[in-house]
């Protein structure tokens, strides 16, 4: 067990669980993705944490913790989400080991096992888009969040190495998300390749996902519940 894991309590207080349930996260996913609560007891020893994050660790208190797993199942970073009103709404902490790993939210050991077994992979942005679509799709698919509307070389290498099924990209419905998904022409008139084409270039089957009813999958669920979610993604499910 590393320092970061020791700093997370996986026994969520009621306000943490209530917050996650209100965002549409099922109890099954709360356990599977190992949502936790900041409970730091010892001082960090990791050089990256000491150099970059030590002064902000107290801001993690009172926030729900979203572990960021390596493909081997080790927690290499966290996202800390505020329950209400605090800014910024999310904080991130990465350990030295995170530098050598693809960083996704949603990549639990159980999700990794399903990817190896041939599950389709959906790529979204944030953690609540992960949990919302995982709720809809069930265990035949794994939903991973890149935490911003882009993929890194490490993301692409991971997908090429592990995915046997199809890939679907369902980024946010804003300009940034759609441009990143489909590609765009930049201010200098140069063509910029989108995430769908980058993944297709790996030799994988990759499709863009178009939906209506909200700026992202979680907003659709918040606006209309499971029925609205099912309707929005009926072409793909």
Language-model region placement:
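TOPRIM metal-binding catalytic domain and adjacent DNA-binding surface shared by DnaG-type primases
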Residues: 1-65, 69-72, 112-116, 200, ...
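Phosphate-handling DNA/RNA-contact segment within nucleic-acid enzymes
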Residues: 39-166, 181
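Short, surface-exposed amphipathic charged segments that create phosphate/polyanion-binding patches used
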Residues: 47, 157-163, 216-230
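Acidic beta-strand-to-loop metal/phosphate-binding motif
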Residues: 123, 165-185, 209-210
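RNase H-like polynucleotidyl transferase catalytic core
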Residues: 143-149, 204-214
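Short, aromatic/basic amphipathic alpha-helical patches
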Residues: 179-202
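C-terminal or mid-to-C-terminal helical accessory/interaction module adjacent to the motor/catalytic core
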Residues: 208, 228-237
């Amino acid at each position: 067990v590393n320092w970061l894991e020791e700093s997370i309590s996986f026994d969520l207080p009621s306000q943490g669980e209530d917050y996650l349930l209100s965002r549409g996260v099922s109890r099954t996913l709360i356990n599977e993705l190992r949502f936790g609560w900041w409970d730091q007891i010892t001082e960090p020893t990791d050089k990256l944490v000491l150099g970059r994050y030590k002064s902000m660790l107290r801001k993690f208190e009172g926030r729900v913790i979203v572990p960021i797993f390596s493909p081997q199942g080790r927690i290499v970073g966290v996202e800390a989400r505020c329950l209400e009103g605090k800014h910024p709404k999310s904080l991130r902490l990465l350990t030295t080991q995170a530098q050598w790993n693809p960083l996704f939210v949603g990549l639990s050991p159980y999700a990794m096992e399903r990817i190896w077994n041939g599950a389709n992979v959906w790529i979204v942005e944030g953690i609540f888009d992960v949990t919302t679509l995982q709720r809809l799709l069930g265990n035949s698919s794994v939903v991973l969040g890149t935490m911003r509307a882009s993929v890194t070389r490490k993301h692409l290498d991971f997908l090429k190495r592990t995915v046997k099924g199809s890939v679907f990209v369902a980024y946010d419905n804003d300009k940034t998300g759609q441009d990143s998904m489909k590609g765009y022409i930049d201010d200098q008139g140069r063509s910029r390749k989108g995430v769908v084409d980058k993944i297709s270039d790996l030799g994988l089957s990759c499709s863009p996902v178009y939906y209506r009813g909200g700026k992202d999958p979680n907003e659709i669920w918040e606006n209309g519940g499971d029925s609205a979610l099912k309707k929005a993604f009926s072409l793909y499910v």
